[in-house]
Amino acid sequence: MAFPTYRPVQCSKLTDHELLRIPHSPSLEPLDYCIEPISYLRRTVYDLHTTVANRSSSRALLHKQPPVMFKSPFGANANPFGGASDGATVGGNAMHQYNFSRRTSVSAESLKPSADTYDNWTPPVHDKTNEQLSRLKTAIAGNFLFSHLDDEQSAQILGALIEKPIPAKDIKVISQGDAGEYFYVVEKGSFDVYVNEKGTLQPGPEGMGEKVGTIQAGGSFGELALMYNAPRAATVISAEPGCTLWALDRLTFRRILMESTFLAAACTRTSSEKFPCCRHSHHMSAQKSPTRWKLRSTPLVRRLSRRETRVTRFTCSRWRGRCLPGEMARESVKHYSKGDFFGELALLNDAPRAASIVATTDVKVASLGKSAFQRLLGPVEGIMRRTKYDDIKTGVEEMDPLQV
């Protein structure tokens, strides 16, 4: 087959003016080059690709390399940053090592921390005897993960926990590298924690790695894998026979424990909108103060005495109360409702309480400790001192020593 002759195209509408050649016909005018059938261009590109492929095949035959053995990116000597593990792999195989050794993806179920995400989900309930409930409350009493829960959330946690007796010694409860499904609270006995530097449990007598700690009764473990959707970071085995654990499944843990933190912060942030320091000040400490508060439900403590220690400032979150200027006063001088606050005077002046606060309904307040109050709200002390109690008709001098 004879191919037509080629010459450079002198046409401003074609960008590849020196490299692109099309068949020449004496009968075509320069304008016709722009509307020449596209099949000639496709044929030219096809011939070019064929030539390059043939030359590459010939070059590969002349410089034949040994086959590259596949190396797992999850092995003991894998490099997560894509670098070569030794000098022999540096070269043509470096790109392959980089691609295979890239960091693996992290995925989990969607969990939007808001009040309307519960949908049709209900926490599981496992029946327990009164004796089991008593032991369980004692086991979680000092655990920091349960300290911020209200009564309703605590009841859900108590109902969802499952008792797991560990009858013998050296029983593996969790293994390093496995997927996390449960969070455990130790009621009785002790458990040893081992960490292998390779990241997973290895075979052999030394496969668990080095012992890094011991968890006694009242402690807990397994929360990191559930919070961060990561493999188990350690191996935990029973250190003595007759141990008892309480297990909480992953979904309940994330729904209750993690969302409760978000809801508590949202509640205190909403209540803080009425604070003078947070409403008028742009200071970063005042804006971050709601994250330091703790929600407290105190149905039994109905009175905050004027003689108590000045350690806490309370904010009304969901209740109604009345302020009494005297110890035996019968007439209230000020009423508090949702969003109001009290207790700042004693903290600003380091003085005794000037009044007694009596709750008329169930109390749910957000409290800020004295040290956090002085550290976070100290820069806005001037705004706090401008707060007046103008609606109080009696006992103003005794109640508000800041007024002059």
Curated annotation (Swiss-Prot):
List positions binding 3',5'-cyclic AMP 1. 145-276
- Can you name a GO cellular component term? nucleus
GO MF assignments: cAMP binding; cAMP-dependent protein kinase inhibitor activity; protein kinase A catalytic subunit binding
- Positions the record marks as coiled coil are none
Pfam families listed in its UniProt record = cNMP_binding
- Residue ranges, annotated region (Dimerization and phosphorylation): 14-144
Q: Which positions bind 3',5'-cyclic AMP 2?
A: 277-398
The PTM Phosphoserine maps to: S105
Q: What domain of life?
A: Eukaryota
Q: Which UniProt keywords apply?
A: cAMP, cAMP-binding, Nucleotide-binding, Phosphoprotein, Repeat
| Oligomeric form and interacting partners | Tetramer, composed of 2 regulatory (R) and 2 catalytic (C) subunits. In the presence of cAMP it dissociates into 2 active monomeric C subunits and an R dimer.
User: What's this chain's function?
Assistant: cAMP-dependent protein kinase PKA regulatory subunit.
Q: Which PANTHER family would you find in this protein's record? A: CAMP-DEPENDENT PROTEIN KINASE REGULATORY CHAIN (PTHR11635), CAMP-DEPENDENT PROTEIN KINASE TYPE I REGULATORY SUBUNIT-RELATED (PTHR11635:SF152)
- Similarity comment: Belongs to the cAMP-dependent kinase regulatory chain family.
Protein name listed in UniProt: cAMP-dependent protein kinase regulatory subunit
